[in-house]
């Protein structure tokens, strides 16, 4: 099981992202893209803030969420109760006793980010072969003509928020290049009364859109829409 990068920071992280993401608006747009699909997989569900909004709008949906962070899943359990089936699993080794109509990720495993004029995939999974395997495992859990949606994120920009009179939460962003590979470095720092009380560093692998779509095609997922680079949608080939 990968290291839980958010252990000890999940409460602060939750408050920070609630202030910086309009989950109701994202949920409304996603539901339009879901159409009549019923069995949904959230890859990297985190604390469940997005799913909370989705099930308020579409309580009949059957949603399963996976994440590698036990601390974030604990918050998701408190938020969602028994409405969502939660699993502490790495998507690289995903094994669920269920097939899905649709899967999506918004930064929990992968997200697209706009780097000026270039669209890049930001992946929590760092090894290229492991990224390919994660795509394969999701595709294996999709029914024929099922869809994968990878959502764009603004997490590649720095941000600082005062959560209350004592606590400040900050995200700083940098890039690193190692032997031709590109990485996005996200540093989350929490200060209380000026003193540092928590710090987590998250490193994400960056890949060009064309390369990512070649990898997805290799597991039977072809691009059908990008909704102005906001929601990249891939569909699994049906049985011939």
What residues fall within each predicted segment?
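A short acidic, Gly/Pro-enriched loop at the edge of an enzyme's catalytic core
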Residues: 95-103
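C-terminal lobe and adjacent flexible extensions of AdoMet/dcAdoMet transferase-like proteins
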Residues: 211, 215-240
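Class I SAM-dependent methyltransferase SAM/SAH-binding core
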Residues: 49-93
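Conserved class I S-adenosyl-L-methionine
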Residues: 1-35, 37-46, 49
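Mobile active-site "lid"/loop adjacent to the S-adenosyl-L-methionine
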Residues: 111-130
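SAM-dependent methyltransferase
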Residues: 147-215
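A short glycine-rich, Lys/Arg-flanked "PGG" loop and its adjoining helix->strand segment in the class I
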Residues: 124-144
């Amino acid at each position: 099981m990968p290291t839980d990068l958010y252990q000890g920071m999940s409460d602060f992280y939750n408050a920070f992202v609630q202030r910086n993401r309009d989950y109701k608006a994202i949920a409304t747009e996603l539901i339009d893209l879901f159409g009549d699909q019923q069995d949904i997989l959230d890859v990297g569900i985190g604390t469940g803030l997005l799913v909370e909004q989705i099930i308020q709008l579409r309580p009949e949906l059957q949603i399963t969420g996976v994440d590698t962070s036990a601390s974030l899943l604990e918050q998701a359990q408190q938020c969602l109760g028994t409405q969502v089936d939660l699993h502490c699993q790495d998507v690289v080794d995903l094994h669920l006793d269920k097939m899905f109509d649709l899967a999506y990720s918004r930064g929990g495993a992968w997200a697209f980010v706009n780097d000026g004029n270039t669209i890049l995939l930001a992946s929590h999974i760092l090894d290229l072969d492991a990224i390919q395997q994660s795509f394969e495992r999701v595709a294996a859990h999709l029914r024929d003509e099922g869809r994968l949606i990878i959502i764009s994120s603004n997490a590649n920009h720095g941000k600082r928020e005062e959560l209350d009179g004592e606590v400040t939460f900050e995200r700083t962003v940098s890039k690193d290049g190692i032997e031709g590979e590109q990485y996005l470095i996200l540093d989350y720092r929490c200060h209380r009364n000026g003193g540092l009380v928590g710090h987590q560093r998250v490193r994400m692998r960056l890949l060009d859109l064309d390369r990512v779509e070649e990898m997805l095609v290799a597991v039977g997922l072809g691009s059908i829409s990008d909704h102005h680079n906001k929601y990249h949608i891939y569909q699994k080939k049906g049985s011939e």
